[in-house]
Structures are given as C-alpha cells and as structure tokens.
C-alpha cells in the first residue's frame, strides 16, 4: 500500500512540474473527424451514403412480393460508423416505380408511379455494412413502414 501511495505522489509531482500532456496532443484527439466506434452524421448526398441507400433498396426489392420495383426518393438522415469497414445507418424514403420486377431495368431509369392507386411511399431505416477492400456489403437491418 505504501508503494502505491509513493507512486501516486511521484506521478502527481511529475504532472504538476511538466504541466501534464501538451494541449496540442489533446486538441488533436478532440478535433478528429471520425472516431472508430462512434457514429457520426454524414451528408445525405455523400457517394457512400447514396450507394448504401441503393443497397438497402435492392434488398427491399428482393424481399418483397410487389410486382413493381421501389427506389430511394429521399435520404432524410445518414450516420456512418467505422467498424471493420463502414456501417451506414440511414433513414430513407422509398417509392414505387413504374418498372416491373421482371423487366430487369436499371433503377435510375425507372420513374416513380404517378397513378394514385399504384403510388406508394415508405419510410425505411436501414443499416448497411460496407467493407470496401473486400468489395463486400451487407444489409443486416431493414425496416420499412
């Protein structure tokens, strides 16, 4: 116990005489833009966000029995987190298009439904995990209502 008290006193003495860690060291850490493990708000028009939103829509289209394809109409919120790749957390509005699933068209070429009986918009929350160096993506969470 006495050795621990001596060590504590020595550390306090050193820090008080040296002034502790330099302010530059602390400010570099605090000013870091993205810290591993912490979600950070990102612009909704960021290319990575747009691609992650498209992955979400593709998963939605593959999981539903709707005869028409949906595509993203608006990304309302986007977060990114560094976790063995990038994890995007997105709030996206998706809309039914005029393209039928069996037509295999590019989603960018599909217009949104204007027919009131066929028009449908859903709000979705998705998490998309992207590992760029492995060209791997996964959509573990997708909820639409």
From Swiss-Prot:
Disulfide bridges in this chain: 99-110, 124-144
GO cellular component, one term: Golgi apparatus
Motif Secondary area of contact: where in chain: 81-85
Membrane-crossing residue ranges in chain numbering: none
Biological processes annotated in GO: immune response; lysosomal protein catabolic process; negative regulation of microglial cell activation; positive regulation of myelination; regulation of antigen processing and presentation
Signal peptide start and end residues: 1-19
UniProt-listed SUPFAM superfamilies: Cystatin/monellin (SSF54403)
Gene3D superfamilies reported in the protein's UniProt record: 3.10.450.10
Alphabetical keyword list: Cytoplasm, Disulfide bond, Glycoprotein, Protease inhibitor, Secreted, Signal, Thiol protease inhibitor
Annotated glycosylation sites: 62, 115
Locations listed in the record: Secreted; Cytoplasm
Pfam families associated with the record: Cystatin
Tissue: Primarily expressed in peripheral blood cells and spleen.
Site (Reactive site): 37
GO MF term list: cysteine-type endopeptidase inhibitor activity; endopeptidase inhibitor activity; peptidase inhibitor activity; protease binding; protein homodimerization activity
InterPro entries, sorted: Cystatin-F (IPR042886), Cystatin_dom (IPR000010), Cystatin_sf (IPR046350)
SMART domains: CY
Self-association and partners: Homodimer; disulfide-linked.
Function: Inhibits papain and cathepsin L but with affinities lower than other cystatins. May play a role in immune regulation through inhibition of a unique target in the hematopoietic system.
PANTHER family recorded: CYSTATIN-F
Family of the protein in this entry: Belongs to the cystatin family.
This protein's name: Cystatin-F
Organism per entry: Homo sapiens (Human)
């Amino acid at each position: 116990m006495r050795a621990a008290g001596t060590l504590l006193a020595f550390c306090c003495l050193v820090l008080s005489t040296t002034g502790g860690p330099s302010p530059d060291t602390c400010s570099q850490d605090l000013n870091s833009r993205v810290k591993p493990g912490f979600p950070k708000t990102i612009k909704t028009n960021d290319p990575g966000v747009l691609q992650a939103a498209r992955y979400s829509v593709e998963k939605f289209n593959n999981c539903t029995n709707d005869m028409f394809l949906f595509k993203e109409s608006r990304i309302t919120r986007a977060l990114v987190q560094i976790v063995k790749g990038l994890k995007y957390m997105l709030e996206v509005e998706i809309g039914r298009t005029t393209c039928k699933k069996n037509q295999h068209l590019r989603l960018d070429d599909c217009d949104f439904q204007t027919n009131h009986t066929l028009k449908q918009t859903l709000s979705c929350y998705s998490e998309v995990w992207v590992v760029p160096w492995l060209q791997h993506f996964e959509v573990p969470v997708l909820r639409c209502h």
